[in-house]
């Protein structure tokens, strides 16, 4: 028997919340073509992700990867912080 190897999905987005311990909420935007008019529209999804070391801040651009479920709502984990938000 040969097993098919699956590669975990990765997405990138912006952190919109880090108030939970070891958790972040990432806003992932994508473009979808309207079925009738053909115009491209922005659609967004909020994904809860696991941040083991609490290293993310609001506004950071991050890369997340799909993993096994960590809790009821978290099945994604932080891979890296791509870009830090500007400190005000």
Swiss-Prot record:
Biological process, per Gene Ontology: translation
Key words of the record: Ribonucleoprotein, Ribosomal protein, RNA-binding, rRNA-binding
GO MF: rRNA binding; structural constituent of ribosome
Cross-referenced PROSITE patterns: RIBOSOMAL_S17
UniProt KW Membrane keyword: no
Superkingdom field: Bacteria
Cross-referenced Pfam families: Ribosomal_S17
Ion transport is among the record's keywords: no
Any Gene Ontology CC annotation: cytosolic small ribosomal subunit
Function: One of the primary rRNA binding proteins, it binds specifically to the 5'-end of 16S ribosomal RNA.
Family: Belongs to the universal ribosomal protein uS17 family.
Subunit structure: Part of the 30S ribosomal subunit.
Designated name of the protein: Small ribosomal subunit protein uS17
Organism: Marinobacter nauticus (strain ATCC 700491 / DSM 11845 / VT8) (Marinobacter aquaeolei)
């Amino acid at each position: 028997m040969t097993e098919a190897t699956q590669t975990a999905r990765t997405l990138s987005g912006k952190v919109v919340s880090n108030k939970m311990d070891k958790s972040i909420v990432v806003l992932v935007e994508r473009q979808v073509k309207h079925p009738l008019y053909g115009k491209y529209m922005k659609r967004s999804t909020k994904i809860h992700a696991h941040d083991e070391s609490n290293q993310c801040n609001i506004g950071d651009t991050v890369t997340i990867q799909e993993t096994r479920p960590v809790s009821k709502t978290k099945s994604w984990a932080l891979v890296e912080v791509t870009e830090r938000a500007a400190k005000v």
